[in-house]
Amino acid sequence: MRKVKPKLNLTSQTARIVNLSHDGRGIARVNGKATFIQGALPGEMVEFQYTRVKKDFDEGKLLSIIEPSTLRVEPKCPHYQMCGGCSLQHMSAEEQIRFKQSHLLDLLSRYGHTEPQSMLSPLTSHHWNYRNKARLSTRFVEKKQSTMVGFRERNNPRFITEINQCPILNSKIDTDIVHLRKLIDTMEDKQCIAQIEVAAGDNEVALIFRNLTPLTEQDELKIRKFAEQFQYKVFLQPGGLDSVFCFYPSDAHAYLSYELPDYQITFQFHPNDFTQVNAELNRKMVTQAIQLMELKNSDIVLDLFCGLGNFSLPMAKHCSRVIGVEGNKNMVERAYMNAKSNHITNVDFYAANLDDVMEVRNLVNTSFSKVLIDPPRSGALEIVKQIDSIDPERIVYVSCNPITLARDTDILVNQKGYVLITAGVMDMFPHTAHVESIALFQKG
């Protein structure tokens, strides 16, 4: 028998916000049931309207704030209420950090069944114009006869938020979004460009145009003029990821670069490569990871999910040898290229299935005193399950998902005999609910 959906009560309601959810929404208790309200802060009395009724929880739209929190600030971005690029601009920067640290500790306790012996001071950076990588959606709207360029709407991802600026994006893109819109407005095929990937190095910014159909000669000319006038490297992507090529300048090499000045290392990367979005925070993160490793000249270090060598190369300057293992062959090639260009010879890189520790052990037949793990959001479950085959004395775990960090912590601490010495948050994505963290485990 078909279930009847509960009817929404569209009359306005009032409630006191008692907490924040993991994604930064305010939580109210209405008739004993949790109601999630975007934009509300703990302690506030708010007026809201129900938008969804579920069995275990409800969702509501914030209508007004009757009693505001002292933690509330005015969002800097004029598009904040609609745009899905941010979710915490209404919260003070200091409170954002406290929220993320509390969330990390809660998950470590609830799912990791432990707590760190000490907490690291949070790593922070500039809160604005920090984001060096982003994917912007584009769409020409016939009714308006204009192009929309921006992030998806927060409450309706089918739609694009029409933005004129973005204070979290790299400052050059923040300024030039309007010009990007004008470019597509003038093209012969205004529906051709589906999205624009932004990738910024220390000195250059690249744009990858995802073109659904071949560009006309006139449109190619317009893109070249745009790139020349506003000083961009432009790449085109007519098909899959392997179809990306440098369109302008036609004689340019395909790489951008960023530096780790403390280690006198320069990394080259393709705009499609994975790199950290926040360059300032990345520099601080690398330094903190190396400090936590307490590297000695005799150490042989295993760097899992090593990417293009972001941790491997600076670590190599402080120990005997580093072995980096990565699942993506292209990134392994990039890591070798960066090692060579920086004259670092005590590193080796391998491509392997990182869900199969025995494959890694067969490739790398040596023992390791220390391991650095920097996995994707899915975490490092298979690695921590089989950590006995590596048996390091010290593990530094860099996480972009506190839920999988907590899960893996439970295994390391409660099954494998490690102690969670310290942990802390890294504010890689200010004004969002994303929690990046770092943790140190020592063999008990």
Swiss-Prot record:
Keywords: 4Fe-4S, Iron, Iron-sulfur, Metal-binding, Methyltransferase, rRNA processing, S-adenosyl-L-methionine, Transferase. It is an enzyme of class 2 (transferase). This is 23S rRNA (uracil(1939)-C(5))-methyltransferase RlmD. S-adenosyl-L-methionine binds at Q276, F305, N310, E326, N353, D374. [4Fe-4S] cluster binds at C77, C83, C86, C166. Transmembrane segments: none annotated. Pfam families: TRAM, tRNA_U5-meth_tr. Belongs to the class I-like SAM-binding methyltransferase superfamily. RNA M5U methyltransferase family. RlmD subfamily. CDD domains: AdoMet_MTases. Catalyzes the formation of 5-methyl-uridine at position 1939 (m5U1939) in 23S rRNA. Its EC number is 2.1.1.190. One of its GO terms (biological process) is rRNA base methylation. It catalyses: uridine(1939) in 23S rRNA + S-adenosyl-L-methionine = 5-methyluridine(1939) in 23S rRNA + S-adenosyl-L-homocysteine + H(+). Residues 5-64 form the TRAM domain. It comes from Legionella pneumophila subsp. pneumophila (strain Philadelphia 1 / ATCC 33152 / DSM 7513). SUPFAM superfamilies: Nucleic acid-binding proteins, S-adenosyl-L-methionine-dependent methyltransferases. The active site is at C400 (nucleophile). One of its GO terms (molecular function) is rRNA (uridine-C5-)-methyltransferase activity.
